[in-house]
Swiss-Prot record:
Belongs to the Fmt family. Gene3D superfamilies: Formyl transferase, C-terminal domain (3.10.25.10), Formyl transferase, N-terminal domain (3.40.50.170). Signal peptide: none annotated. Keywords: Protein biosynthesis, Transferase. It comes from Xylella fastidiosa (strain M12). Attaches a formyl group to the free amino group of methionyl-tRNA(fMet). The formyl group appears to play a dual role in the initiator identity of N-formylmethionyl-tRNA by promoting its recognition by IF2 and preventing the misappropriation of this tRNA by the elongation apparatus. The gene is fmt. Pfam families: Formyl_trans_C (PF02911), Formyl_trans_N (PF00551). SUPFAM superfamilies: FMT C-terminal domain-like, Formyltransferase. GO terms for molecular function: methionyl-tRNA formyltransferase activity. This is Methionyl-tRNA formyltransferase. It catalyses: L-methionyl-tRNA(fMet) + (6R)-10-formyltetrahydrofolate = N-formyl-L-methionyl-tRNA(fMet) + (6S)-5,6,7,8-tetrahydrofolate + H(+).
Amino acid sequence: MRIVFAGTPDFAVPSLRSVTQRADVVAVYTQPDRPAGRGRELMPSPVKLEAVARGLPVYQPQTLRSPEMLEQLRVLRPDLIVVVAYGVILPEAVLAIPDDGCWNVHASLLPRWRGAAPIQRAIEAGDTETGVCLMQMEAGLDTGPVLMSLKTPINAHETSGQLHDRLAEMGAQLLSDGLGLLRAGLRPVPQPQLAAGVTYAHKLGKVEARLDWEQPAERLACRVRAFQPWPVAEVVLSGERVRIHEALALDLDHSQPPGKVLAASKEGIDVACVQGALRLCRLQREGGKAITAADYLNARRDLQVRA
């Protein structure tokens, strides 16, 4: 089976490894090298690094819509194109090239959380369950029929980074299972997505990281987890803007205004929210590294409040 693999970030690497064990990967498509780091040097994508290490041909077009790119894909004669977090929309002309179409591994239980940030939005919304889907691609954004899926609970204190790593491995396993069926002549049966329950996971932005104490503590705790490791939640704490790497929601009755420090100890800094309180456990001052609440309080003697 001849497969073209298209993917870019870390999430796609386990799937690429999985495909190489099941089929002949004739080409890997990934986004062009991007400037990164303080020196703004061009850096290859994680998928490119993996593909090069495996001796696979790598292509990095700016677009797949040009006649030259379409002809290049046709010459490769793929039976199937596998897409995992590629970051480039495949035009219908590309979708029509492989005999078996194009498959996509998506990090949610479709139709919930179509779009660019399904992992973060699931945690932000307080979802207790998510999963991965293997989808037959069509022209719409994550609208294609679902071939297979795997479910998993979202753990109470799980961050987006932690869930990302679990779902990446689950997606690779799901893809391997699907390819195994296809090779055996047992094509997975496409199940159309239901119109009910569609939600969209729009791309994360840095401005979202700024938390507002005028929200319930439970929602803020979910956002702290959702925005870890990027863009990392930010709050104003007694006049200082700090980043929050870990926090807990407290079901606490109080009559204090939102943003008021209620208690501060080595366990954490409890801040009043419009409903409940948020305990800040790991913080980061501007220009510093993430530290415990105890270490932060050593530098902020003005916050030495006791419960």
